[in-house]
């Protein structure tokens, strides 16, 4: 859960699918947490996938991404592992040597986000959508990263849980370059971060 002073730079980035233009000549610098806002289908997920290196832009470049803590559009949890085990996958070798201590901290974090003993004992495939989302968000926050890229991390959470998750995200992200894609206006208000609009 490191904090860095790097800057994420997007330079003249464009993405087209055939004749459809998602964004064109997009340039911005992200050095603090920010919300990436646009209605569904306007390219938020595609932009994050480009920043993660999972998709190529039509043109333009990206600098300063470094190591990424990510919440994907799909949760991408290991279905046979528990929530705690999924989060522990991102522990560094140093942390893994003291994994008992860190596992207790991870468990406490999951409890704070509303996973009870029953949920903590289940494999990820049996968790609800909201429980999976909370696990994915916590995994991103535990990763040793230079940048956080979060695609709709509050999906499936009720308002009370979303507020707890947003508070944890604000506390853990610090001033690390962060892009959180959402069209949820309540989440935007809760975070209080600057908003970058697509489209």
What are these regions (language model features)?
Residues 52:
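Helix-to-loop junction immediately C-terminal to a conserved catalytic motif
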Residues 81-95, 105:
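Q-loop/switch helix immediately C-terminal to the Walker
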Residues 101-118:
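Conserved ABC ATPase "signature" region
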Residues 123-127, 131:
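Conserved ABC ATPase signature
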Residues 137:
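Hydrophobic anchor residue at the start of the ABC signature
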Residues 143, 174:
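Conserved signature/switch motifs of ABC ATPase nucleotide-binding domains
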Residues 148-152:
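Catalytic Walker B motif of ABC-type/P-loop ATPase nucleotide-binding domains
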Residues 159-161:
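Helix N-cap at the start of a conserved alpha-helix in ABC-type nucleotide-binding domains
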């Amino acid at each position: 859960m490191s904090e860095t002073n790097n800057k994420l730079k997007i330079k003249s980035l464009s993405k087209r699918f055939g004749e459809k233009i998602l964004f064109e000549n997009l340039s911005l610098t992200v050095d603090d947490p920010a919300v990436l806002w646009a209605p569904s289908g306007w390219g938020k997920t595609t932009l994050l996938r480009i920043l993660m290196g999972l998709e190529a832009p039509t043109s333009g470049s990206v600098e300063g991404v470094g190591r990424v803590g990510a919440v994907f559009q799909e949760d991408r949890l290991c279905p046979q592992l528990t929530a705690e085990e999924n989060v522990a996958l991102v522990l560094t070798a140093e942390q893994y040597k003291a994994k008992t201590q860190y596992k207790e901290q991870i468990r406490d974090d999951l409890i704070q986000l509303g996973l009870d003993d029953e949920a903590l004992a289940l494999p990820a495939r049996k968790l609800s959508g909201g429980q999976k989302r909370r696990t994915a968000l916590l995994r991103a926050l535990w990763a040793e990263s230079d940048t956080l890229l979060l695609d709709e991390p509050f999906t499936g959470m009720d308002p009370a849980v979303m507020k707890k998750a947003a508070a944890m995200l604000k506390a853990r992200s610090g001033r690390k370059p962060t892009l959180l894609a959402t069209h949820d206006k309540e989440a935007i208000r809760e975070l209080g971060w600057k908003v970058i609009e697509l489209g």
